[in-house]
Amino acid sequence: MIKFLAVHPGPLMYTKIYLRLEPIGLELVAQAARQAGHNVRLLDLQVEAQETYFRLVEAWTPDAIGFSCNYLANVPEIIDLAKATKALLPNVFILIGGHSASFVAKELLRHGEGAIDCVLKGEGESAIVRALAAVGEDRKALSSVPGAVSIEGDGPPASFVPDLDEVSPARDLVAHRRKYFIGVLDPCASIEFTRGCPWDCSFCSAWTFYGRSYRMRSTERIIEDLARIREPGIFIVDDVAFIQSKQGFEIGEAIAKRGIKKQYYLETRGDVLLRNKDVFAFWKSLGMHYMFLGVEAIDEEGLAMHRKRISLGKNFEALEAARALGVTVAINLIADPSWDRKRFEVIRQWCLEIPEIVTISVNTPYPGTESWLTESRSLQTRDYRLFDIQHAVLPTTLSLPEFYEELVKTQDVLNRKHLRWSALKSTAKLAAWHLVRGQTNFLSMLWKFRSVYDPNLQLADHYRPVHYELDPPSALQSSGSGLLSIHAARGRRGRALDDATERFVDKTRAGSTP
């Protein structure tokens, strides 16, 4: 039996204000390790101090520590923690896994300078069991673990979890569950209905990670999981919710039958909403009050750049449909570094004219995305910490100080519309309800914006000493899913979609990836 400590790194810029989600991916990995008979603990540095981590490491002396690395901006923190941990416990086995880690595995090993023993690419639930077995028996056996990358060599290609029903999140291992929230859903738990995305947007690495596969959990296991959750708010973590109406209705009907009362927040595409309006209307009756729509751009040129094969008219029609449902809608727009002052002003005026919550992120090429291969040669920085969709890593048309001035001015639209005290008039009862229950995550958003989103602070981030830098794409690489994919594409058989939905997806994506 191995003593295994699973660790989630600290918060990023936007998680200090808008949301703080439970580490469901790490909970799944932890449960898989526990089911294999190991002694497992989980520590989330989003809500715990690093001092707590080091006290636990010294007191418990784990045999293995696994860091979750889903975001590039966390890489320096994880590397430094690994090095400091090895100094305390030279024999501890340190591994890193997660979405972003899968695309930069070799770089992580190099940055670690011997402190990192292994990087696990791909889904972690099955890989962690075999990796921990190797730690306890024969570390040379790591070379046979699918997805394992170590200094000694690489294992076979990453493999999928055979059945998503096999493992449920180890929610009991998380110490501060009331710290997790998204917007007004405070506290909020997370749940997974499906995994993967069948579309192929150029700015996204979800489809390359999963090889454009799409898999579903059974309704029975979803309901079992949901019934055990005590939090009143639920964030559905699927990349695109309710692609197929049948599954949406089946889960919803089972929820109604069990009498489960929750409030739900989900993410979907505008064309999926328009195709399956009846499903979303049904879920509104079940408690779906909040929805995120990936609009990305308000002009056809922007949509084409991000390879979203949905017309501007359809996006606006989807917004109307969501309004008709009576749900609170949040949308994201991607600010391109090429924007000038006039473009920012157009966006600001549009944001002020619509009722939706608007967030603004910065166009950022990531390893694993097609835009990484096509745009990264013009990167103006390779500092991992700036790859958080809140900093400009590509050259800007405006000077960098001017770009951040305009960006924060535009982001402040959200603050003016939804986060200032005047906006609380419509949510006064909700705010009071949170306070009575001792929940302050939602209310803290009201005054945190100015302390986090500051153009001077964002500019200063570019001048911090840089100890770890991303490798640029190899000059030999070219665009193509085979070079990008972590899990090999399995074509049509890898997608649990009915034929009509498969045809719908093909008509609404721009690529030719199988």
What does each model-identified segment do?
Residues 2-5, 10-13, 145, 149-193:
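N-terminal [4Fe-4S]-dependent radical SAM core
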Residues 2, 19, 25, 32-160, ...:
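Glycine-rich beta-alpha loop elements in corrinoid/cobalamin-binding modules
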Residues 2-6, 15, 39, 57, ...:
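Radical SAM enzyme core and accessory elements
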Residues 60, 251-255, 341-357, 418:
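Short, electropositive alpha-helical surface patch
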Residues 13-16, 104-105, 199, 246, ...:
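Flexible glycine/acidic-rich beta-alpha junction loops that bind and position SAM and/or redox cofactors
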Residues 107-128, 280-291, 347-361:
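Structural recognition of alpha->loop->beta junctions
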Residues 8, 42-46, 208, 294, ...:
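Residue-level recognition of beta-strand->loop/alpha-helix junctions
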Residues 21, 171-333, 337, 349:
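Radical SAM [4Fe-4S] cluster-binding motif and immediate context
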